[in-house]
Amino acid sequence: MIFLNINNLNVSIEGKKILDDFNLTINQGEVHAIMGPNGSGKSTLANVLAGNEDYEVNSGKIIFKDSDLLDLNIEERAQAGIFLAFQYPVEIPGVNITPFLQSAINAKLKNNKKPELDNLSFAKILRKKAEALGINTDMLKRSINTGFSGGEKKRYEILQMSILNPEFTIFDETDSGLDVDALRIVTEGINKFKNEKNSFLIITHYQKLLDYIRPDHVHVMRNGKIVKSGDISLAGEIELSGYQNF
């Protein structure tokens, strides 16, 4: 089943073209990885999929589950099942993690015409998922990402993903700034969440992340478009010789 279909997408920012007739198809349950040098358009793609209005879509289509994604705003995309894990998660002082996540999941449940979770029911779910990810429950009393280490910020994003249960998750260089132990914890969380009903797009510079999360397809991106696609062996080729051959 085709889950996401991007067809001839052209995107610019401040008059500069970033994505150039970009095409990509992701089926339900698949994990795709996009690799490429700085400036190739990887993060632009992630932001456009999530609905960042700083980018201008000049032409093309993005079909997600039979709906035109370009007709939906950021909130509508989130409610439709899209989740973006940022390269640099922002700090939100004064906004506590627990009520924020409860409000987010209840908004999604309400949108899907399902009963909302009361405080006790949500607290039990949150604690269980936090413990499964190795997150100290004291962290749940803090403001979002405020004073967090790089690893804590990434773990919180995985917790958020686990709570919201999105159908399509985009990881924009989620391995950036992580040491080996933090990378292992984060990728274990992703692998626990992965199943045949949800799909992933992993954007990264390095093969190391793909040693932990084995993608079904690997793509090389340069100058705003995919220039080569293959399996995990393509990531190994990049590790050995870089991007000069593409």
What are these regions (language model features)?
Residues 26-28:
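Conserved hydrophobic segment flanking the Walker A/P-loop of ABC-type ATPase nucleotide-binding domains
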Residues 4-6, 19-21:
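Conserved structural motif at the start of ABC-family nucleotide-binding domains
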Residues 61-77, 145:
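ABC ATPase NBD Q-loop/coupling interface
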Residues 170-174, 181:
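Walker B catalytic motif
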Residues 35-37:
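The feature captures the beta-strand-to-loop junction immediately N-terminal to the Walker
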Residues 161-162:
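ABC ATPase C-loop
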Residues 84-88, 94-110, 122-125:
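Q-loop/switch helix immediately C-terminal to the Walker
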Residues 217, 221, 225-246:
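Conserved beta-strand-loop-alpha-helix hinge in the C-terminal portion
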